[in-house]
Amino acid sequence: YLKPLLLLPLIFAVFISTSFKNKIILLAALVFSWLGDILLLFVFKDAIYFILGLVAFLTAHIFYIVLFIKEIKKANGSIQFKNGLTLIAIYLTILLLMLIPHLGGLVIPVIIYAVVISTMLYMAYLLSFYRPKPTSAYLLTGAISFILSDSILAFNKFYHPVPIAGFLIMVTYLYAQWALVKSCIK
């Protein structure tokens, strides 16, 4: 029940921070993540809350993708194939092959979500080439932590219980959000 409260200081910090060109997009990503956190609190009442939470996080990741693409273009970079795409695709394939037999009617939504979050990681990976250190490290570790958080959640929910799943999900998720914000705010 604390997870939505823990994201509010981060949203506030971005809101009051010095303006930067894509601040609204970052705020939108955080607010949709916050809405996803709230919706997931009610999963025990009805499965629709899981779907709505998934949609909220999907929207947040789309905002992160847009943010990263805009930042790549701002750096006069180009979106091109890099080796990281292969690693991300392998991870995505293995995870989905493990989960799909256990997803039931959620196969399509989970595949869509997994592709979108993998795209977010790939855009973060590309953007990291145009960012100085340590900003690029925050960006990459934040995006990877988001994937880890969602992977633990999915594995725990659909495949096999993970010991201390709640703790692992919260730690990786909160670090992910903090690191992504840290990579954007100067």
Regions found by a protein language model. Give the residues of each.
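Polytopic alpha-helical membrane-helix bundles and their juxtamembrane interface segments
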Residues: 1-186
